């Protein structure tokens, strides 16, 4: 609903890619991008990572993708800084400037937006600031800060599952989404927040050291 309604609101045209970020399927995405020059391009981080080797060696693909492009958007997972910088390099080499890269954060239960980046940023991982009408609360959870969200976009609960609904909301009515975040700049909250993995997937080693899976996954990839 986010992408469709944004397109309708601005009188645009929406193209649905039949390709996927998987071996044997990313080639369809490459072929599609040679036919269509988007003004806004949406993909998940894995999609960009699989697309990059083609962009780096295929001039026709680069020219088609960047010709009219205003925004590269990603969500659903963390984009690595390496992929961010490689995308910037291809943009600069093709059209002489960096295309604005932005991200958002949310879940199905939040319909789906909670935060958005709406200004130029210089690094991967920033998920922006709360959208109008939405409140975020950062709650200490072990050694991280858990994000909780409240607003008109948040589901009132799970159909016929009062047990799940009760467990999903805190005493202030904030939805406990299970993700973690931190400020991009502790002294300047307006610079946005950074996605910091999940709080529920972390575990402790026998040495007593916490392993933060989200951060580890980003570094390994």
Predicted ranges, named:
Residues 1-15, 31-34, 39:
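Conserved short alpha-helical elements in the N-terminal third of ANL/AMP-binding
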Residues 2, 7-9, 67, 131, ...:
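Short, solvent-exposed loop/turn segments at the edges of secondary structure
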Residues 15-16, 42, 73, 102-103, ...:
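Structured core elements
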Residues 19-143:
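Conserved adenylate-forming
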Residues 140, 145-205:
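Conserved ATP-binding/catalytic segment of the ANL
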Residues 215:
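Phosphate/diphosphate-binding loops
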């Amino acid at each position: 609903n986010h992408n469709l309604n944004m397109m309708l609101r601005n009188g645009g045209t929406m193209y649905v890619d039949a390709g996927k970020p998987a071996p044997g399927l990313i080639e369809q995405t490459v072929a599609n991008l040679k036919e269509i020059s988007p003004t806004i391009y949406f993909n998940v981080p894995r999609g960009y990572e699989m697309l990059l080797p083609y962009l780096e060696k295929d001039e026709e693909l680069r020219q088609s993708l960047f010709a009219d492009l205003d925004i590269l958007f990603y969500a659903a997972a963390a984009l690595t800084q390496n992929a961010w910088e490689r995308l910037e390099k291809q943009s600069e080499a093709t059209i002489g400037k960096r295309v604005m890269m932005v991200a958002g954060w949310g879940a199905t239960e939040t319909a789906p937006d909670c935060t958005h980046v709406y200004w130029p940023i210089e690094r991967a991982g920033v998920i922006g600031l709360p959208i109008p009408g939405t409140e975020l609360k950062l709650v200490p959870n072990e050694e991280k800060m858990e994000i909780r969200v409240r607003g008109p976009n948040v589901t009132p609960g799970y159909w016929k599952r009062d047990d799940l609904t009760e467990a999903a909301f805190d005493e202030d009515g904030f939805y406990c989404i299970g993700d973690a975040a931190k400020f991009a700049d502790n002294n300047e909250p307006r610079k946005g927040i950074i996605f910091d993995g999940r709080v529920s997937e972390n575990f402790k080693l026998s040495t007593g050291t916490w392993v933060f899976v989200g951060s580890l996954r980003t570094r390994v990839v």
